[in-house]
Curated annotation (Swiss-Prot):
Disulphides: none
Signal peptide: none
SUPFAM superfamilies: Ribosomal protein L10-like (SSF160369)
Species of provenance: Methanobrevibacter smithii (strain ATCC 35061 / DSM 861 / OCM 144 / PS)
Record note on quaternary structure: Part of the 50S ribosomal subunit. Forms part of the ribosomal stalk which helps the ribosome interact with GTP-bound translation factors. Forms a heptameric L10(L12)2(L12)2(L12)2 complex, where L10 forms an elongated spine to which the L12 dimers bind in a sequential fashion.
Family: Belongs to the universal ribosomal protein uL10 family.
Superkingdom assignment: Archaea
One Pfam short name: RL10P_insert
Gene it is expressed from: rpl10
HAMAP family from the UniProt entry: Ribosomal_uL10_arch
Function: Forms part of the ribosomal stalk, playing a central role in the interaction of the ribosome with GTP-bound translation factors.
InterPro entries, per database record: Ribosomal_protein_uL10, Ribosomal_uL10, Ribosomal_uL10-like_insert, Ribosomal_uL10-like_insert_sf, Ribosomal_uL10-like_sf, Ribosomal_uL10_arc
Record's protein name: Large ribosomal subunit protein uL10
UniProt keyword list: Ribonucleoprotein, Ribosomal protein, RNA-binding, rRNA-binding
Length: 335
């Protein structure tokens, strides 16, 4: 039987203790992160999360041993890529992912690095005087020329597509142009919480879109609850108001007299009476003196509105005439 180094046993035990202590356990990739930057990131996570670097096979062993108490946690082994480390926290996976993503910074492209996104060179002035750098740009595939005493990029260009390797020449050119296209930070590969594994694809959500979706779902649920008359804490007030309004309308339409409906019923009846009286007012003897007076009062009350409208129209016409005269005067002035 092969002898197992004591330090490996201790390392597995410490990993197991860490995994057992926290509810949320993740696998992160620390590849290509400079030591100083990693130290700053770990400091920023102080009291929020613990990062422990270790060998993949030792992490595998720790996950297997912890699978009895944390069902399915062994599945994290499927997501170990790059320079692996374990991250342990009490934050929910989505918050952890956001914090790690927000901590990422831009960095220069190194020869041999794989572009995670398209590296785009924008159109415009490079800030360089005419010289050998023009040939260097053209050599790596950047359309450049001299314009007004400066080297300019004549057209926006995708220099390196996502997934392609950055050559030494391209890395040198990008460095001289002060373009830092790479993103350096802790990559969260997968997280375990309550027997579920969340990959980075699941955790990468659009916060604004998610909020809009939740608000839309709430509106739809609210409307459904109101229309189906399903009372809840949020909808009961609206349901009662809607029911009251509908009851009043039914009472008015059916001429059922109550303390709430009597006034609108009488008002509606009077309006119908006056409308009918107006229709027959041209027939001699059709209206008694009282009804004729009421109809006359309605007509007089409406007259000022009509006169005011006519006056406003006349004023508008006068303003338009004045504007046309002014325009004609300006036309004559400027030939």
């Amino acid at each position: 039987m092969a002898h197992v180094a004591e330090w490996k046993k201790e390392e597995v035990n410490e990993l197991k203790s860490l995994i057992d202590k926290y509810d949320v356990i993740g696998i992160v990739d620390l590849l290509n992160i400079p030591a100083k930057q990693l130290q700053e990131m770990r400091k920023s996570l102080h009291n929020k999360a613990v990062i422990r670097m270790s060998k993949k096979n030792l992490i595998d062993l720790a996950l297997e041993d912890c699978n009895a108490s944390k069902n399915n946690i062994v599945d994290l082994s499927e997501h170990m890529e790059g320079q692996v480390a374990v991250i342990a926290t009490e934050m929910n996976p989505f918050k952890l992912y956001k914090i790690l993503e927000d901590s990422k910074t831009s960095a220069p492209a190194k020869p041999g690095a794989i572009a995670t996104d398209d590296i785009v060179i924008p159109e415009g002035d490079t800030g360089f005087e005419p010289g050998p750098f023009l040939g260097e740009l053209q050599q790596v595939g950047i359309p450049a020329k001299i314009d007004k005493g400066k080297i300019v990029v004549s057209k926006e260009t995708v220099l390196v597509e996502a997934g392609e390797e950055v050559s030494a020449a391209v890395a040198s050119t990008l460095s001289r142009m002060d373009i830092n296209p790479m993103e350096v930070g802790i990559d969260l590969r997968a997280v375990y919480e309550e027997e579920a594994i969340y990959t980075s694809e699941v955790l990468a959500i659009d916060e604004e879109q998610t909020l809009a979706d939740v608000q839309n779902a709430f509106r739809n649920a609210f409307n459904l609850s109101v229309n189906a008359a399903i009372p809840t804490e949020e909808t009961i007030s609206t349901i009662i108001t809607l029911a009251y309004t509908r009851a009043i309308n039914v009472g008015v339409d059916a001429a059922i007299m109550t303390s709430e409906t009597s006034e609108p019923i009488i008002g509606l009846a009077q309006a119908k009476m006056l409308a009918l009286a107006s229709e027959v007012s041209g027939t001699e003897g059709a209206l008694d003196d009282e009804l004729a007076e009421k109809l006359s009062n309605v007509a007089v009350a409406a007259a000022p509105v009509v006169e005011e409208t006519v006056e406003e129209e006349e004023e508008e016409e006068e303003e338009e005439d004045a504007e046309e005269e002014a325009a004609a005067g300006l036309g004559a002035l400027f030939g």
